[in-house]
A protein has these predicted regions:
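Positively charged n-region of N-terminal signal peptides that target proteins for export
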Residues: 1-6
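TerminUS-proximal long segments
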Residues: 377-423
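A contiguous strand-loop segment
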Residues: 52, 95, 100-169
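Bacterial N-terminal signal peptides
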Residues: 8-16
Length: 423
């Protein structure tokens, strides 16, 4: 017999019809409070029910084959900016090529690139449909939209006019990614786990935007990348000390997705994106569940419910940090569906839909009534799949010092995997 928590709105009480353990949660000891999840340094993708690439066995095979073929090159192309007219500034001496040399320029030179017929022009001079800006230095080479980048800048004609692409080595790319996706002052094993996950993710998704002329974006559609401008000593160290290492399943790089906090337990892929993936399974983590709360009016919720007079809400009990077996929650306790009971009948609303409507940090939540308010008490931040960044930090704090412990962290969150050096 299923055990449910039923909110009887006429009584404005939370009446448990089964035992419910709402364990108290604590922030990571000795670190910043959980409000750090509001910071862009920790990934804040609240992916819900929107369309996500379905990782079926066949699609996964094709993507991993691509990743294997590309790994030997160790280069990646990142889309930086598109527009009708763009500019860049050389931070050291550089030259411009478009099949042949278009000239050399001293450090500090600013060039403007714009659409010209079917091609491009540089400072008003026609130059072809593809232009390369190459620096003679090895450090920060170019400034684009306020950030500094290593490597080569490629300009290509695009529907919007011109697109600037950064051609850079995989390791230099990661130096500009990792500090944007995690807190650089965290434990080194947590940072290394993020570095390996980011490398693996980039390899798996390489060529994902090839139709636009590059491999990955510089924003949360893939991974946030800010080039040299974002680099720190700690994150650079993590990248270099794990150079060439990726997470593999069956010998192939995985889709190493990550999120800020699992809230005590991560989730199975099929409960978030619809299709099972063998290495994206829910696993328990230290109960640093990063609690959050949101309050909305019962009148607005009743209007959204569209079931007439709202009589009650049916949702099974939440047990933080424990595996769940009820049909309305995923294994972690993330809400799959809520039943709204009304005078016109019942309506089932998905947890993803509620997350979208009310901009919730996650679908790991419980519901209660206080007066004329509906209180949503939640835990965790993000979709709950794969690597939990706060969970990784908690593991690193507890077991820090063990040799290569970041590999243990990764293999905990990505079930049945290995960490291997592929180049």
């Amino acid at each position: 017999m299923k055990k449910y928590m039923v909110i009887l709105l006429s009584l404005s009480l939370l009446l448990p019809l089964g035992s419910a353990s709402m364990a108290a949660t604590q922030p990571v000891p000795g670190k910043s409070t959980v409000t750090i999840h509001k910071s862009p340094r920790v990934i804040t993708r609240k992916t819900t029910g929107q369309k996500k690439t379905q990782l079926s066995a066949e699609s996964h095979r094709k993507r991993t084959e691509t990743g294997q073929k590309q790994s030997a090159g160790q280069m990646i192309e990142v889309g930086l900016q598109s527009g009708s007219e763009l500019s860049l500034t050389g931070l050291s001496a550089f030259h411009v090529e478009a099949g042949s040399s278009l000239g050399s320029y001293p450090a500090g030179t600013r060039l403007t690139i714009s659409k010209s017929g079917n091609g491009l022009s540089v400072n008003g001079k026609s130059a072809g449909a593809k232009i390369y800006f190459k620096s003679s230095g090895s450090g920060a080479a170019f400034a684009v939209k306020g950030n500094q980048y290593r490597g080569v800048i490629k300009a290509i004609a695009s529907p919007s006019g011109v697109t600037l692409v950064n051609q850079v080595s995989m390791e230099d790319y990661l130096k500009g990614v990792v500090p944007c996706e995690i807190v650089p002052s965290w434990q080194m094993d947590a940072i290394k786990a993020q570095a390996v996950a980011a490398r693996t993710y980039a390899m798996f998704h390489k060529n994902g935007y090839r139709s636009a002329g590059y491999d990955v974006t510089d924003d949360t559609r893939t991974q946030v990348y800010r080039g040299v401008s974002a680099e720190t000593e700690a994150t650079n160290r993590a990248v270099m000390e794990t150079a060439g290492e990726v997470v593999t399943y069956g010998g192939s790089p995985i889709d190493a997705v990550f999120h800020a906090s699992g809230g005590g337990y991560t989730e199975n892929c099929e409960n978030v994106w619809g299709s099972p993936v063998p290495y994206l399974k829910g696993v328990p983590e230290d109960k640093y569940a990063t609690p959050w709360k949101k309050t909305i009016s019962l009148s607005s919720f009743t209007k959204m419910a569209d079931v007439g007079r709202l009589k009650g809400i049916k949702l099974s009990a939440l047990h933080i940090g424990e595996a769940h077996k009820t049909s309305d929650r995923g294994i972690s306790g993330r809400v799959k569906s809520v039943t709204l009971v009304g005078s016109k009948g019942n309506r089932v609303v998905s947890g993803n839909r509620l997350q979208q409507i009310y901009d919730l940090n996650s679908t790991l939540f419980d519901l209660s009534v206080s007066g004329n308010q509906l209180v949503i008490t939640g835990y965790g931040y993000g979709h709950g799949l794969g690597l939990s960044q706060w969970g990784a930090e908690a593991m690193a704090e507890k077991h820090g010092g063990a040799k290569d412990y970041y590999k243990t962290i990764l293999m905990h969150y990505f079930t049945g995997t290995k960490v291997e050096k592929v180049y």
